[in-house]
Structures are given as structure tokens and as C-alpha cells.
Amino acid sequence: SKEDEEYKERALTATFELQQGRRGYRALWKHIMNVSVADLKKNYTNLNVEFDLWKGESDVQDIIPKMADAMKEEGYAYYDQGALIVDIKEESDTKEIPPCIILKSDGAALYTTTDLATIMDRMEKYHPDEMIYLADKRQELHFTQVFRCARKTKLVNEDTRLSFIGFGTMNGKDGKPFKTRDGGVMRLERLISDINEEMFRKIVENRSVKDKEAEGTAKIVGLSALKYGDLSNQASKDYVFDIDRFTSFEGNTGPYILYTIVRIKSILGRYAQEGGTLEKGVMLAPVSESEKSLMLSTAAFNGMMEGAF
């Protein structure tokens, strides 16, 4: 669309007509959504992630007209060059904050519009104390506009907290956004598959196990590699996803931690076989600085877990 203005115009028109409920467009859109959501749920299930609600922009499409009319009637929104906007600049601003566009000149809604309508919907249904948005850190200006507009137009209560948590991007070894070997955008399903394949290769290479058993183990260890590799980096910073490093059984990796847990369980298992029980165990004083350091680190575990939560 950057090079073909006619195509861009047709796309904008189609978007507007879809938002207005054109039947053929809506039917096609619903089919695409059903296929996409089913695939998303499958991928999230593979990551042991569940959501209580599955909602999209279209769920608030019907309340946008009511919201826009209220903003106009209460004097918050006005037309400028055909677009409906709300000024959100503040005296304390050190840089220019553009106005919040509610409706484009052709009447079409934007991400800003649906985000505001979603806030309105959540306030009416759930009355939350706080709403936390997690998105690419490059969306910071967008959410600054949305939050300011929501407060100015009284979509939220004065004491309702609106928070944005920006995260960095997962990049390849070249420092650019992570892609497939053929240069395409890396899909989550493909990423999970690649990691599982790499873990399977390493497990079969280093241990004599049956393929079926190795496949099951690869999925468990692969999940730890992906999750730990992502969470071990500061959320707001970009990082390089190196599949060789993340799937390694050495160093600060998910597979290494699982390997360590297995070793600990093995030691405890042998201890139990010899008649020992942890319940009757006695805490011994450390006999070296390394033991003391380990015990202090272990004692801090509960506090670290509470802080992370």
C-alpha cells in the first residue's frame, strides 16, 4: 500500500465498511477470526497459558458511536479537518503530545478508538481498580494518548490506575527482529517447533532413549528453554534469541535448571531409599563460606517469589 495509492484507498474503504457491519465482509472476517483464535489457543496451550476472557476490538464496535457522541456532547471532542479529536496536551509536557483521534475524517475507528471503548466497557462490567497493558515498548506514546483521553473524558474514575508495561523485541543474532531461516516473520508455532526439534536432537545425541520418550522430554525441556530464556532477560529491553544457547544444558538456561532439579531429586530419592526422611532432618550449621552463601540464597527464595508475583 505504500507504493500503490489506489490499493491503499481500497483497503481503507474495506476497513471502514467492515467496521460498519457489511455482511459479506463480516462473514469472511468471522471465519478468519475463528481459524486464528483456534490456532492461538493451541499455541498457548502448548505454553501452559490460559486466559479467562478472549476479547478483541470487534467486541466493543457497537458502543463506539455512543462513546463518540458522549465525548462531543460533553465538550471534550471536536472536529478538526473532518476528524473527531480530543486535545490531551498538558502544561508539564516536555515534548509535543498529539491529540487523540477518536474517528477519522471518513468515520472509521482507530486502535485508539477501540482501546478507549474497551476501557469504557471494562469500567461498566468489572469496575477495576487498575488496568495494566502489556505491549511493545514502542507503543508508549499511543497508551499515553489513550490514558490521558480516558481520564479527560471521564471514562475512568479519578482513582482508577492505568498502567503501561512496555517490553522489548526478540531479535536474531544479527540484532534484527527474529525471523525464520527463509527470512519470513517467525510465528510462535514455528518457534516452539524449532526449539522442540533442537532439544530432541540434543537428547537423542547424548542419551540412549526411545524416540517417543525423547519427544515427550524434548517438549518439557523445550518449554523451559523458551520461557526461561525469555524471562531471564529484562522485559523492557530487546534481546538476542540464540537457540543454541537457550537450549544448552550448561550455563544460565532452562534446560540446565531442570537438569539440576533432576539431580537434586535423585539425591533425595537415594536418601529416602536408605531410610532417611526430610521431616526428621536436622539443619546443620555451614562449614564453609560457599555453604553459608548457598543457605542464605535459599532462605531468600520465598521473598523473591513474592516480589516476582
Question: What kind of region is each of these model predictions?
Answer:
Residues 1-309:
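Non-catalytic interaction-recognition regions
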